[in-house]
């Protein structure tokens, strides 16, 4: 009756495939001497001391085991009258078929097990366009970046260590990343010690990757072990270089609850866990082979205190002292300054296997990074103002796999079944990814960006010859008519707590303008008085201004990051899929629901000061021309002068 139900399900469901992060093991069991296939032989797979799945061969000695979580397994074949053979370390990759034949020898040392070490084939029969890297291979590589591991595959280009990859000429964003079947948004966030394998597909993409235009990088995390084990890793370069690379990693795995065997001993694990994590602190994440040039500390301190010098022609104003530095004022340093990165990521998984046909996995990853980002523009004079960025990603998932068919079926019944390897998988996941980009000192206090102090402008009326008409009386006045307002004094009250380096430009400019008795644009005397904002000539800085660059090559000292931004991306996914084998044909079906939510907020706060200067008093810039105010003396005699009040708009 059960088989009839399976048949109906298989016929009703169409082959619309949803993603399943599992692999398949196929092969033939045969006699070592004669080469004849062995029907009804038992084949099982084990990992970490747990028997995870098994089957029997058909009349042709063929077997198929699926679904199998990607990883390394021991494959064991047994049959009455033959020596047991076990192949260790067989690699099962996601969405691929691994072919493994076994040959049994009849009647030789039946009590012994022949153990053979698996050898990775040079050519993968089910994936000629890609490659799989195992945990052992990943650890042996001189990198901890998933993209860098993937770049060792033919057809993949990577510009530099840790950068995104280009697959067969496609753009970087055409590469899709998956972790345990979850499409990645944000950081991958899996510690190296928690990676079971990385599978790269560069061509011939399966149907479930319908939205991938470049290639696929699929990461499978490690699962629990039947025995407790743990590891600790510590790395540091602080004694040998200035990059100060420091890393601490750990991994823990083991059973929480085990089955009881008939004899009372503990059997395979029912509930198991795996937990891994890494913390990394490094001062320079991308060192230069030739070092970096920077201005010397004592020279920088002098520039901050004395940013200007008088021009040879004093009437030309001032020149920036940064433009007169020589080679002796610079030094080459091994590591970039103020580019520290702190990163923490942890990955965990709980596996439940109450029966041989039911499997539930719950897990997640957490990734957090805070860094000061390198800027070539600020590297020479103002690396202290490098941007601060942060990223936080967490990912949760749950997956249920239910196989059909009893493990207690007879060999004949199992091998002759029309429908085999029937199962369904239900998976749900949620991802949250957040970014921030700010100035480290001001963050979201927007009005502190570029603030150097308080400026006050003093004005007086400006007159010119002409006529004025009183609209209410029709009287026409001739004489000196009020035509506008002119600046008479421009003062600066320095802020001594925020952006001191920027404020020093303005303080020094006001002081030198007075010391050298320069003339204002709106003055006639060389009295050293600044009367209008135009007198600053782009050297004395107003709120929101940045200093002039050094030969258009580097930002001058005090150049700060002008940005404050937040970004959040979320993803919720639900998938269900099923599969069954009818003879040598596989029928698969499923669906996938994915919902994304993207939000971003950001601005260049220093630009607000320019807008505020344009908008301040905008409503009283005009004169009330309809209501002139003629000036009369005490005797009522017109003084040939007409004033206007401001017109409020």
Locations of regions flagged by a protein language model:
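Cleavable N-terminal targeting peptides that direct proteins into the secretory/outer-membrane pathway or into
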Residues: 1-22
């Amino acid at each position: 009756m059960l088989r009839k139900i399976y048949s109906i399900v298989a016929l009703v469901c169409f082959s619309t495939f949803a993603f399943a992060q599992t692999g398949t093991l196929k092969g033939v069991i045969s006699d070592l001497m004669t080469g004849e296939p062995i029907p009804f032989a038992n084949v099982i797979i084990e990992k970490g001391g747990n028997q995870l799945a098994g089957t029997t061969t058909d009349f042709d000695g063929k077997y198929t085991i699926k679904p199998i979580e990607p990883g390394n397994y021991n494959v064991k074949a047994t049959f009455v009258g033959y020596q047991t053979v076990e192949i260790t370390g067989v690699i099962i990759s996601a969405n691929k078929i691994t072919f493994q034949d076994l040959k049994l020898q009849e009647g030789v040392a039946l009590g012994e097990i022949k153990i053979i070490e698996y050898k990775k084939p040079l050519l993968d029969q089910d994936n000629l366009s890609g490659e799989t890297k195992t945990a052992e291979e990943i650890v042996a590589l001189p990198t901890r970046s998933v993209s860098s591991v993937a770049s060792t595959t033919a057809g993949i280009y990577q510009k530099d260590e840790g950068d995104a990859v280009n697959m067969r000429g496609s753009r970087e964003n055409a590469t899709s990343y998956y972790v345990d079947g979850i499409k990645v948004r944000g950081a991958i966030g899996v510690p190296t010690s928690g990676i079971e394998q990385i599978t790269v597909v560069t061509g011939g993409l399966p149907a479930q990757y319908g939205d991938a235009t470049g290639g696929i990088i699929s990461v499978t995390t490690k699962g629990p072990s039947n025995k407790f084990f743990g590891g600790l890793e510590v790395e540091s370069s602080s004694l040998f270089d200035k990059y100060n690379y420091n890393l601490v990693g750990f991994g823990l795995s083991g059973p929480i609850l085990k089955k009881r065997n008939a004899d009372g001993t503990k059997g395979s694990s029912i509930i198991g866990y795996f937990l891994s994590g890494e913390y990394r602190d490094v001062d320079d994440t991308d060192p230069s082979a030739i070092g970096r040039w920077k201005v010397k500390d004592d020279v920088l301190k002098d520039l901050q205190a004395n940013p200007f010098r008088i021009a040879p022609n004093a009437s030309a104003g001032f020149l920036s002292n940064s433009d007169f530095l020589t080679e002796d004022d610079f030094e080459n340093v091994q590591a970039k300054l103020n580019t520290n990165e702190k990163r923490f990521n942890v990955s965990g998984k709980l596996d439940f296997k109450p029966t041989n046909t039911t499997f539930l996995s719950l897990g997640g990853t957490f990734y957090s990074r805070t860094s000061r980002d390198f800027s070539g523009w600020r590297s020479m004079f103002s690396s202290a103002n490098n941007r601060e960025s942060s990223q936080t990603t967490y990912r949760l998932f749950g997956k249920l796999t239910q196989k059909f068919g009893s493990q207690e079926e007879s060999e004949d019944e199992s091998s002759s079944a029309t429908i085999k390897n029937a199962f369904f998988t239900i998976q749900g996941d949620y991802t949250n990814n957040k970014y921030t980009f700010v100035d480290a000192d001001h963050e979201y206090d927007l009005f502190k960006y570029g603030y150097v102090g308080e400026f006050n402008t003093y004005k007086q009326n400006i007159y010119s010859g002409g006529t004025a008409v009183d609209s209410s009386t029709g009287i026409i006045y001739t004489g000196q008519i009020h035509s506008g307002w002119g600046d008479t004094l421009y003062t600066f009250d320095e802020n001594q707590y925020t952006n001191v380096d920027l404020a020093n430009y303005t303080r020094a400019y006001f002081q030198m303008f007075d010391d050298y008795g320069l003339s204002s644009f709106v003055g006639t005397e060389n009295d050293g008085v600044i009367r209008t904002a135009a007198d600053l000539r782009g050297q004395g800085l107003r709120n929101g201004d940045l200093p002039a660059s050094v030969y258009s090559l580097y930002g001058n000292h005090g150049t700060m990051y002008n940005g404050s931004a937040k970004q959040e991306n979320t993803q919720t996914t639900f998938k269900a899929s099923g599969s069954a084998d009818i003879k040598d044909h596989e029928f698969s079906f499923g669906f996938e629901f994915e919902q994304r939510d993207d939000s971003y907020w950001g601005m260049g706060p220093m630009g607000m000061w320019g807008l505020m200067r344009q908008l301040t008093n905008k409503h009283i810039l005009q004169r009330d021309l309809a209501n002139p105010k003629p000036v009369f003396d005490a005797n009522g005699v017109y003084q040939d002068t007409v004033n206007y009040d401001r017109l409020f708009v």
